[in-house]
């Protein structure tokens, strides 16, 4: 992970520790439905049924712990839920301080992950492409899946060339800005996108 990427995610989670947390847990929310549908589940109940036999679940690259909390809600009480993140472990730990049988650690997807052991289900989404070596990170995470277990990953797909160019252009311009300034510029661009989409 580059220094700018690490700084950006550290700022994102430390300055917004509850970002999308409640919405991720709220049944029927757009965020929760997106998480469920992109992983092939029609409902919370379907994911709960899938997770029922799990004894260990990992959220690799857990950010503020919002999906870790969802996994905790949907797994049996005896299931150990582990989350780790390179830059936001403290934020996730604080957000999940009252959750039972949840362990949050600092961890790097590019480092040796054997200390975490093996898991029945490993969730690693919106993370691999930010590591600087997605292939190595994928292989590390895949190595934590027990025989018969499952790995659920999500990486951003490459968009149309003009969109990729625009994303790179904007990212290059705001990368060195202080967080608040970069956030304000991003909010303006997002609003412009909404206005243009509504036309």
Regions found by a protein language model. Give the residues of each.
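Conserved N-terminal segment of class I S-adenosyl-L-methionine
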Residues: 1-117
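Short N-terminal helix/helix-N-cap motif within the alpha/beta-hydrolase-1
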Residues: 69, 131-136
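A conserved beta-strand element that flanks and buttresses the S-adenosyl-L-methionine
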Residues: 123
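Hydrophobic adenine-recognition pocket in adenosine-nucleotide-binding enzymes
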Residues: 127
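Short glycine-rich, flexible loops that bind phosphorylated cofactors or substrates
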Residues: 130-131, 160
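A short glycine-rich, Lys/Arg-flanked "PGG" loop and its adjoining helix->strand segment in the class I
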Residues: 135-147
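Conserved class I S-adenosyl-L-methionine
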Residues: 150-191
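Alpha/beta-hydrolase
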Residues: 193-199
């Amino acid at each position: 992970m580059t220094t700018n990427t690490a700084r950006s995610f550290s700022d994102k989670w430390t300055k917004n520790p509850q970002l999308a947390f409640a919405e991720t847990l709220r049944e029927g929310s757009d965020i929760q439905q997106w998480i469920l549908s992109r992983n092939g589940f029609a409902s919370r109940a379907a994911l709960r049924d899938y997770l029922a036999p799990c004894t260990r679940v990992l959220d690799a690259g857990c950010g503020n712990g919002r999906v870790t909390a969802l996994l905790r809600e949907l797994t049996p009480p005896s299931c150990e839920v582990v989350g780790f993140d390179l830059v936001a472990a403290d934020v996730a730990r604080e957000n999940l301080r009252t959750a039972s049988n949840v362990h949050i650690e600092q961890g790097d997807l590019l480092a040796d992950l054997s200390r975490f052991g093996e898991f029945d289900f490993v969730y690693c989404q919106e993370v691999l492409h930010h590591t600087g070596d997605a292939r190595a990170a994928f292989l590390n995470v895949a190595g934590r899946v027990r025989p018969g277990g499952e790995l659920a990953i999500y990486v951003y797909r490459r968009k149309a060339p003009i969109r990729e160019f625009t994303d790179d252009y904007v990212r290059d311009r705001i990368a060195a800005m202080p967080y608040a300034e970069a956030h304000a510029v991003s909010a303006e661009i997002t609003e412009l996108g909404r206005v243009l989409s509504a036309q």
